Curated annotation (Swiss-Prot):
Keywords: Aminoacyl-tRNA synthetase, ATP-binding, Cytoplasm, Ligase, Nucleotide-binding, Protein biosynthesis. This is Histidine--tRNA ligase. One of its GO terms (molecular function) is ATP binding. Belongs to the class-II aminoacyl-tRNA synthetase family. It catalyses: tRNA(His) + L-histidine + ATP = L-histidyl-tRNA(His) + AMP + diphosphate + H(+). It comes from Mycoplasma mycoides subsp. mycoides SC (strain CCUG 32753 / NCTC 10114 / PG1). It is an enzyme of class 6 (ligase).
Amino acid sequence: MLQKPRGTQDFFLDEAKLWNKVETKLKEILDQFNYSEIRTPMFESKELFIRSIGSTTDIVSKEMYEFVDKKNRSLVLKPEGTASVVRAVIENKLYAEENLPLKVYYISPMFRYERPQNGRYRQFHQLGIEVFGSDSIQQDYEVLNIATKIINQFKLNKNIKIYTNFLITGKNREDYILELKKYLSDFKLCNDCNTRLEKNPLRVLDCKIDDKQFKNVPSMQDFLTKEQKTRYDQTLELFKKTNISVIHDDKLVRGLDYYTGFIFEIKYLNNNNEQTIIAGGRYNNLVNEIGNINLAACGFGMGLERFINIIKEQNSSLVNQKTNIDLYTICIDDLAIELNQQILDLTRSIGLKADSNYYHLSLKSALKKADKLNPKYVIILGSNEAKTNEFIIKDQINKTQIKTTLTKFIKDLK
């Protein structure tokens, strides 16, 4: 029997409904902040991700799904969303002054060839938000504020921690890297980190194998310029004044090379294991690196698989919330098919949800089916109802019933 590829999932019935509810709620939150949706292709040129994410990252060096098309062009399935959005902004000239600040979001499948495990898949879904054209501290605040609002709106406050850092740039970055290299030279590093040490030493701090041994990492804070330090302090003060509790982490660098300035990760503590659920920050140089356009930018990404797993653990009310329909009709005789269809069409015409048993079931089985759908009203139609155009509407909430006619039913609906 043919089966789905390893690291992928099928979504159906209650699981698909839960995903739909989560995505709808996320879009409602982003609409409150005036973000609009953007959709980009499922695959892009390989060069886009090499230039944006960085050639030394695990994503580019190990995890991309690559293929060559019939014109010998190197393409990849999207491993993340930001680079695609930046490409779209440049190609479609969305950086025009009248569009700024440009605030967009996407919910899209991504693809990475990594070992499948709990909450991590080779095809996964990501919510991302991106803001272009604003270098304001208030914009950094808004991005993290949206992330915390998502956590709060889904009632996931338990075991949540927010970590922040400020990545230095320019000459000070070079000085810090020299100090970091000196510090790391005393450790026995994994093979990947030995490569990173030469190409991008900051990435060593993001290693899942070696990071536990780095206890006294040189602090980036000691190398920030006065301007950078002031900006970071003002950002943290804004969080403090609005009761957003954050923890500074010198080892936080993010797994993508394009980040500069303020960065953050929101982590969930699960059985003494911290899982990142939302992460992002500022990447002011990325648009310039891809399209030679100076445009400030910031944003975040959130893996929906892991997020929904946490919802299942903490928010049972959303998981167990039944999707009600307004009317369920049970047609037990072919003579009542026309009447049944008239009732359904009229109900749906005014925006109500209605369904029926379109195949022959015993009355007992049909009533069981109705119970699963949790309708407000149930109508049973047989040959007598078809002849008289009279039928009984059962109110499932108030446990009452009334007899009515098709004419009166139409009038009551209107």
